[in-house]
Amino acid sequence: MKLNKKGLLIVLSGPSGVGKATVRKALFEMTNHNFVYSVSATTRKPRPGEQDGKDYHFLTKEEFEKGIENNCFLEWAKFIDHYYGTPKKQIQDFLKQGKEVFLEIEVEGATHLRKKRIPNTVFIFLVPPEKKALYDRLKKRGTEQEANIAKRIAKANNEFHLAHKYDYIVVNDEVANAADRIIAIIRAEHAKTKRSIRNYLKILEDNGYAEQ
């Protein structure tokens, strides 16, 4: 019996401005677990401090649309006149290596991804402690005009109604607390019966007790 350990695909999603990147970065700093971040692609301009290939793959509209034609994205969506997408190959490679792959994507992208029913995928919806916090965070960025902030808030109001379709909801009241909750979720997912049995059978196999 040959069993390969495969990692979880952890989809961290939520409205724009909820703090997905901040929580994910804090989580990576808090643990030495086998986490990798799947860098998304976008056609929007980099924000201050963002690096190409680290925070996003920044593409032109033409480059992104060519990627769509060539089926290079696991999921993609258009949001406030910009494309966002998840390159497919890097995720496949990471999961085969048994790594825990973090996706940090918009709600529309998560909706498309859920329809693919990829095994070992965990969907986490990040929400602010109150709606005003979302506006304050978007305003604090200093990169959005008031009209765009209004569009993002209106979209967020619709997205909140999709929270029940996720496996977990995490409130981002304090970054460290939110990161702790996600770590607890991942531990709980690994403790689920199906995954525990898979790991137990692997231990038996390694010790010569595998089925003949």
Swiss-Prot record:
| CDD domains in alphabetical order | GMPK
Spell out the subcellular localization from the entry.
Cytoplasm
Q: Which Pfam families does UniProt cross-reference here?
A: Guanylate_kin (PF00625)
The Guanylate kinase-like domain covers which part of the protein? Answer: 7-187
Is Cytoplasm among the key words of this record?
yes
A single MF term (Gene Ontology): ATP binding
Q: Does the keyword Transferase apply?
A: yes
Enzyme Commission identifier(s): 2.7.4.8
InterPro entries the UniProt entry points to: GK/Ca_channel_bsu (IPR008145), Guanylate_kin-like_dom (IPR008144), Guanylate_kinase (IPR017665), Guanylate_kinase_CS (IPR020590), P-loop_NTPase (IPR027417)
Give the domain of life: Bacteria
CC per GO annotation = cytosol
Q: Where does ATP bind?
A: 14-21
Similarity comment text for this entry = Belongs to the guanylate kinase family.
Functional summary from the UniProt entry? Essential for recycling GMP and indirectly, cGMP.
> Which named protein is this?
Guanylate kinase
**Organism of this sequence:** Onion yellows phytoplasma (strain OY-M)
By which gene is this protein encoded?
gmk
